[in-house]
Amino acid sequence: IETPVGVVEVSLAQDGLVSVENVPSFRYGEGVTVNVPEWGAVSGEVAWGGNWFFLVESQGPPVDAGNIEALTDFTWKIRQSLKRDGITGRDGGEIDHIEVFGPPSDSKIADSRNFVLCPGKEYDRSPCGTGTSAKLACLHAAGKLAEGQMWRQASILDTVFEGSVRTEGDESVIPLIRGRAWVNGEATLILDPTDPFRFGIQDCGDSSSFKAGT
């Protein structure tokens, strides 16, 4: 499957579960601290799993489905603070995903539970494939996950991905993510070259050249 960051391989098992071999993933920074309004110093790791992530362990509101609004506010403040302080991924890559972790609701089905803030101030209903890849890379870099060892990541809704890594001989690992998914829609994106916002609305800069109503 072609993705914006490269081709990923997908395997479908007879039981309906899908395995995805993701792009090379790695931890870029550890012990990164940012001052977050109303929360003070928050420490985390910066990692690449197909997107740039800031991963936070056991800080902020409890990772529970009843705290989605509070978790959204907390992670959004982290993202804004990272941008304010110029903290980025490699080559200035914007950290546009914030992932916080807490204990699982049931240790029999998962090793950890997460909440993932995505661009647009949305959150991921799943454990997040790229986010789980970033987590696996951090665990491996910290010596907490051996090659081939299984990690079970639960989402804020308690859906679970299983993940492991294959080493590459350098700083990166190849994550293998296994889980279940359902097709819930199809879309065709049309990029009109005359549309100034065809690639989305981010930092629009000087919009004085745009006509009213565009």
Kindly label every feature range from the protein language model.
Residues 1-214:
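Active-site proximal loop and beta-alpha junction motif in alpha/beta enzyme cores
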